[in-house]
């Protein structure tokens, strides 16, 4: 693409594999190539009934020592009996789950929830996982400043000639 000016909203995880001519400054290229990203995954679990709303349930928000880590109900104001529990996990747990197939991720989610809520298995319908680090458009999740990278954010945001960086 050729243009007089450009607003670029591409994560560094993708940008480092795009040929740019003329090249960005050495400082910008270093930051693009070395930007650190975390690992994050969501697993949405659909159930025929919202058993977590029952009076004797342990609740709608559960923090665990399992690979699912944090589980929240995600069916607020949704009509009907069905409901969604959503797990947020990151770091090593997300990396380990990220190496598994979608079916295996769902199986782990189902089994984990059945240990937390006795009735979970009988209402289970399906699970779907999103691991941002395997997404072809991001190849990463959240970025953060690693050791020695305190200036990266400023450098990555700085315009390079007619190219402006967003996101």
Model-based region annotation:
Residues 2-28, 41-44:
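Flavin (primarily FAD) binding-site architecture
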Residues 9, 18, 39, 53-167:
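Conserved flavin/dinucleotide-binding core of flavoenzymes
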């Amino acid at each position: 693409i050729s243009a007089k000016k450009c607003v670029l909203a591409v994560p560094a995880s993708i940008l480092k594999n795009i040929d740019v001519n003329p090249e960005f400054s050495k400082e910008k290229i270093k930051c693009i190539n070395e930007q650190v990203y975390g690992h994050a995954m969501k697993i949405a679990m659909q159930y025929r009934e919202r058993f977590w709303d029952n009076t004797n349930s342990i609740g709608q928000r559960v923090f665990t020592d399992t690979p699912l880590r944090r589980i929240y109900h995600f069916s607020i104001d949704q009509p009907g009996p069905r409901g969604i529990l959503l797990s947020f996990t990151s770091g090593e747990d997300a990396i380990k789950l990220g190496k598994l197939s979608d079916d295996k991720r769902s199986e782990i989610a189902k089994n984990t929830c059945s240990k937390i809520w006795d009735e979970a298995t009988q209402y289970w319908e399906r699970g779907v996982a999103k691991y941002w680090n395997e997404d072809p458009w991001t190849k990463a999740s959240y970025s953060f400043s690693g050791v020695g990278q305190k200036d990266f954010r400023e450098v990555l945001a700085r315009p390079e000639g007619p190219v402006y960086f967003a996101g």
